[in-house]
């Protein structure tokens, strides 16, 4: 085992190679909608490539500590956001925390007052944390892919749709624990009544009714 080693990773391929070594316990990585959708200096990799890193870290038990959740502050203003629409700090933090493998988010702060403001994240309503607006400016390749935002909630059947999708995505890449977590859910894809409520609300145009059938068939 190698202790106390810190190295830089210049791109997505390097991260995958590092994960291949099975030597790391933690990965510091910049996670935010801009970088995930290929906007910004540190936007390494495409939508699918970055998603694979998140899922693989979860599978391997490598915790992701998030840097630059606000894309250097650019996402907080209509004028500087690459999407032309601002997000709040709380939306950005929630976005990062919803990614597989993410354990901590480390936003920058210049004062105690800013830290106090960020800590109010824990006092926010679900509506204040809802970042589904990014569906309106996500790139075409992101369409049809669940990001676990749960904007489709509440499910009339009581299914935690985001969790069901996350555990399915993790299970399909070989995460054995994901199956256990899925089966431990109070409600799962088998409880779907195909009412279409989720499809009508999804900002990413995910066909959740079809997904639920696929997930049901996968887990048996």
What role is predicted for each listed range?
Residues 1-65, 70:
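Glycine/proline-rich, positively charged
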Residues 23, 48-220:
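Structured C-terminal cap/extension of enzyme domains
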């Amino acid at each position: 085992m190698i202790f106390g080693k810190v190295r830089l990773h210049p791109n997505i391929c390097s991260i995958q190679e590092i994960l291949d070594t099975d030597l790391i316990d933690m990965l510091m990585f910049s996670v935010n909608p801009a970088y995930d959708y290929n906007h910004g200096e540190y936007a390494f990799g495409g939508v699918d490539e970055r998603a694979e890193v998140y899922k693989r870290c979860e599978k391997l038990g490598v915790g992701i500590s998030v840097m630059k959740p606000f894309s250097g502050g650019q996402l907080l203003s209509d004028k500087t956001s690459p999407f032309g629409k601002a997000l709040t700090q709380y939306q950005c933090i929630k976005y990062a925390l919803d990614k597989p493998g993410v354990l901590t988010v480390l936003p920058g702060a210049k004062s105690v007052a800013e830290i106090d403001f960020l800590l109010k994240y824990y006092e926010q309503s679900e509506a204040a944390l809802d970042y589904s607006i990014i569906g309106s400016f996500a790139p075409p390749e992101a369409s049809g892919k669940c990001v676990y935002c749960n904007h489709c909630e509440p499910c009339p059947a009581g299914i935690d749709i985001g969790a069901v999708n996350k555990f399915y995505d993790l299970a399909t890449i070989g995460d054995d624990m994901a199956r256990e977590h899925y089966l431990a859910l109070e409600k799962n894809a088998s409880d779907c009544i195909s009412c279409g409520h989720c499809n009508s609300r999804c900002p990413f145009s995910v066909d959740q009714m079809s997904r639920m059938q696929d997930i049901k068939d996968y887990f048996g």
